[in-house]
């Protein structure tokens, strides 16, 4: 701002000086013109023709001068604008230089910060290198220790596992052998048990059969004895009846021969019917009974035959009503037949009840057998080891049940067949037996005798056989039971031992399995630890690789930063050298700026005086215009007057012509002075147009002829050594990579066409101009 004020004050001072100089020149010209006008008035009037021509020339010259003045004024205004623009450009250049210096300072600060960062990074890198080396060393030590521990633990565990495996294999082999032996023993024991059970069942069945046979033999003996007694009684009765019949036959053989035959036939038929009824009832009873035998059937038949013979042999009793003897006999026979039917019905009902009781017993036994089968099945489910034996037993029991049921059905069918056969046989044999009754009585007597003898023999044999069989059976059963009990005890002891051994083996197997499980868990834990350690090692290796990568990146950055630092240091060296040159130039520039400021002040004063002169000249030019116009009017009037008074006043015309010629001479003088002033203005134009180019650079200026450089410093001044004619531009690139300032060449040729006298006369000091090449400085 102070500089602008100074420049504006210098300009105003120079303009005032220029105006004052112009006014002085006008004042000098005016007395000269007055003096010349007075001299011209004295001249002759012969110059009137020349005056007209001169007036025309003056008009033309005035026009040309007016045009030149307008052009000069336009040039002056344009040059003022250029001066303002050059001042702005100089200010901008100074601001750019300040910015460049600030950027240089910032770059220095950044370089210092980068140096600090690089130092910190170097420290960190060195620290990280040491830490990495320590980590790697610790990792290697830990890895080696862990590998050694793992190897030792694995070797120990493998040895322990091998020893335990060998021991377990031996134990397993022993247990397998023992189990095989035990299984063989168990199979043999099971087979022996099965054989013994089969033997027991067979002996039990034999005992049951023998007991049944004994009971049957006793029952047969009892029935035989009873039948013998009944037969003896019946034989006695038959003998008595036979005697009676013989007596009756002898007494009434002749009289009742025909009737007796009819009655015998009727009674035989009736007896046949009653006998058939009784035999039918007896057959029904035998069909329903399950334990009837052929011997009992024959005894019953014998009893029935005896009853029929007794009924047939009843004597005929005559009735008082005039009935014959055979009719009374038939009536007497019907009554006991009805009684016999009732008794047979009672017997049948009793037998039916007995059969129902037996059926209930059989059903109860069947239920018991089924319950036993169920119990056996439950025991088979509970006792898995004896399942085969129990299943075989249940199968055998079921087979026995099926066999019993089949035998039962076969017995039923046989009983039915026997009964049917017996019925048919009885029906067929009744007729023959009735015919053979007489012959059979004799045979019966013989048979009774034989039977008595056989009975005695049988009783003796039965007693002997019973005693022997019972003794043998009891002895054999006792011995077999003792043997079986001993075997069962031995087998039970063996089973207990085997169970104890089995429990021991199970406990050992459990212990071995627990040991194996613990060893497996330990192995799994070791494997897990190994995996964890491997994972940790992998993580550490990954971290190491990442740290190595970061270290390499930091190294690269460090190398790049070192390269940048070297470049920056080189650039700083160059900048320092340039700064030294700038500092050297600074003093020169300051001294020159002081001189230039003094010259500028003087020249600004001169410019002001020139401006004042220009104003005065303009004022004088306006006055001259007015005078010229007035003169033209006067000339026109004078011509008119001269035309009117050519003959009257020739003397007056000559005087007027002389005055006009003097005025013309004065005008010519003023025009000459104006031409000189215009020439001085033309010199100003030449100075302004022919001034050298001064391109400003941010970093420095180098000269071409004398190798002298121009630099801009902080005091916003230009410095040079010996006023070189021209300063050629040089370019320098900024040292830092982040910011670069474009350098512009500055050239400052000084024109030597005019001398120092002309410069002082013009009153211009340093003038800045701007063109395509840069800033121009004219002195």
Curated annotation (Swiss-Prot):
Residues 1-55, 253-274, 315-336, 718-764 are annotated as: Disordered. It comes from the Eukaryota. Residues 47-200, 337-674 form a coiled coil. Residues 1-14, 256-272, 718-731 have a biased composition (Basic and acidic residues). It holds the Pfam family FPP. Keywords: Coiled coil. Residues 324-336, 733-752 have a biased composition (Low complexity). Interacts with WPP/MAF proteins. Belongs to the FPP family. This is Filament-like plant protein 1. It comes from Arabidopsis thaliana (Mouse-ear cress).
